[in-house]
Amino acid sequence: MKINRYMKKSVITIKSDQPVSDAIALFVTHPIGMLPVIDENNKLVGVLALEDVLHLVMPASFDLVKDLDFLHDLGATENASPSSEELHQPVTNIMTSPNSTEIDFTLFHAAAIMTKHGMQDLPVIDHDGKLVGLLSHVDVGRGLIARWHLQATCKGKQE
């Protein structure tokens, strides 16, 4: 089961030299949690997760704290916002290195990468490193259960 049957081919991206404010605008206007970061040749150079942007205003220990009232008392309120300097910096300053898969790999391979790295979305590249799609954990799950459903249906007809 090849990835290209299940991936999204229309992907919202951001260029590596665009400011963080542009990324924020994309996160606000589209139901996405991750932006593939591409260069001028459409090559994947990184990923920018919504969490990367949120960490601009959240304390570094935010992920470790379970008591949100405690954070509120320390001043990490919903009114916090990034500074002008943080908003105007290029996304390359806060993006992370991309994990990706190639278009001719299987869903099982993609699932292994996503599980290993705790990813919800996985950029798909061609042999030249150019972004050609995005595969979500839902896409992978749908593809896998479709195969199981087909096998069960065929087996049921044989009996």
Where are these regions (language model features)?
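Bateman/CBS regulatory modules and CBS-like beta-alpha motifs in cytosolic regions of diverse proteins
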Residues: 1-32, 38-40, 44-45, 70-113, ...
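Short hydrophobic beta-strand motif reused across regulatory alpha/beta modules
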Residues: 46-51, 133-141
